[in-house]
Amino acid sequence: MIEEKQEKAELWQYIEKHRAQIEKSLREHLPLAPPKIETQFNEAVEYALFSGGKRLRPVLTLLGAELFGGKAEIIMPAAIAGEFIHTSSLIFDDLPAMDNASERRGKTSLHEKFGEGLAILVAIGFLNASYGLVFVNHANLPERAMLAHAEIVECIGAAGMLGGQSVDLALAKGAGDVSNFENESVRNLKTSALMRLSLRVGAILAGASHLDLVTLSRFAELLGDAYQLSDDLIDLEEDSAIFGDAQKTFAINEGKQTAIRQLQNIVEEAKRILVENFPPSEARSCLLQLTDYLAQRKA
């Protein structure tokens, strides 16, 4: 098992240090409608974005930048792009045509509270706002900003969020299966794409090399697999009965112990990639601790 000495700051200290700055930046860049045409749109935007959440994606962007010497205060506008896209994906995921979920994070889902039409508009608003966060706010680094902008396009597209959602729809209808982890990784397209986006945007804006970005992408994909598999294990632990006619997952098909072993293998491989390819730093230490957290989290 790969271990690393504790560095200057623990993961949770790092998150707390940047939490206020993240929340401030989220509020400063809300995709709000002008007062003249505003109805309930702005209320729905705030409801969707400030309904809880760990702000994992902004933290990943900051860590991705700091891994290559970037500064949080410079990267911050771009750091919230992943959170906007993540929020949009949750809204779409809950819609009647998708998962038809009535709750999200213990609260009424957006389409249940504000209506399906407004929920779709809010989701599109978050996606649209994410582009400007990297391009407009980092115009002084045009080449890097363009590369970061391209990351958003890829994340949202068929190789990422849209593709992942289409896989979810197919699995819900009984097409395909997740009886092996290769198929499960396809199911995780949305999760892994957002992890990859968050880390790579920060790294790109900090000047990471192409080779470093390739390595970081592999780590991000493993992080996404670990996050999704731990989610499935949490669901399995909370109430296995709910899966009677629901979408099958690797954890359900293969059993809890097999899934736990698979999760441990993913975590160790992700940590190995970090340790072997990036020098010791606060950012690396926090990413290692985050990887361990995903293997141990209960909610």
PLM regions: where:
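N-terminal amphipathic/basic leader segments beginning at the initiator methionine
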Residues: M1-L30, A299
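Short helix-capping segments at alpha-helix termini
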Residues: N277-P279
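Mg2+-dependent prenyl diphosphate-binding active-site environment of isoprenoid biosynthetic enzymes
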Residues: P31-I273, A283-A295
